[in-house]
């Protein structure tokens, strides 16, 4: 059975936070545009490659006008701690760096942004459900299904800039990963299977 990604169910299970609530908690300006950044390392590449990827993305970020960014830190993969140190050094009024937003704030913030930048699986799986444009950088997610709201690009500054220039055309809802009712369908399929098994046993 194909039921979708259970993680999508969180959007329907939670009461998402408002823009004003997010602005207050994250010390952001609600009148500015927001973008969400999560950049993990590419473990098959060198540390220099990964730091260059982060630097290229940052250079694109500071060129955006009237935009504030929330950067969630990289995971524990090779190179992740160095990427996090890089972001910590770049934090300012328009670049907020957090270790984690937590599920509710993350989903709420994603629903309010102009786009998602980086290479996190949340840009591949969760963002399409909301129709939020995604600029997927590099090869970390290579081989996964790419929904119609996702723009894939290389790691150079020029490629990232070009991809961001297209985001207005990529605000497209894509429910390839599910409709938010995967858990219900899983439970129902298990019940149906057990009922069929009981009938056959009798």
Task: Kindly give the residue locations of the regions a language model identified.
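Catalytic donor nucleotide-activated moiety binding site of glycosyltransferases and closely related
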Residues: 65-100
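Short acidic-hydrophobic, aromatic-tinged amphipathic segments that line or gate anion-handling sites
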Residues: 1-3, 98-99, 151-156
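A nucleotide-sugar donor-handling region in carbohydrate enzymes
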Residues: 1-50
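Short hydrophobic signal-anchor/transmembrane segments that target glycosyltransferases
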Residues: 52-66
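Nucleotide-sugar donor-binding patch of glycosyltransferase catalytic domains
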Residues: 128-172
């Amino acid at each position: 059975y194909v039921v979708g990604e259970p993680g999508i169910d969180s959007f329907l299970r939670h009461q998402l936070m408002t823009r004003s609530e997010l602005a207050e908690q994250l010390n952001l300006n609600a009148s500015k545009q927001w973008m969400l950044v999560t950049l993990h390392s590419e473990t098959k590449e060198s540390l220099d490659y990964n730091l260059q990827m982060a630097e290229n993305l940052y250079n694109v970020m500071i060129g955006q006008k009237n935009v504030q960014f929330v950067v969630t830190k990289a995971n524990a993969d090779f190179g992740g701690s160095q990427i996090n140190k890089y972001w910590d050094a770049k934090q300012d009024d328009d670049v907020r760096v957090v270790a984690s937003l937590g599920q509710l704030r993350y989903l709420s913030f994603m629903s309010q942004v102009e786009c998602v930048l980086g290479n996190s699986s949340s840009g591949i799986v969760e963002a399409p459900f909301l129709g939020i444009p995604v600029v997927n950088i590099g090869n970390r997610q290579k081989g996964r299904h790419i929904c119609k709201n996702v723009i894939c690009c290389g790691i150079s500054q020029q490629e990232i800039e070009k991809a961001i220039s297209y985001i207005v055309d990529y605000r497209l809802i894509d429910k390839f990963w599910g409709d938010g009712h995967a858990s219900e369908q899983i439970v129902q399929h298990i019940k149906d299977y057990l009922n069929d098994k009981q009938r056959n046993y009798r």
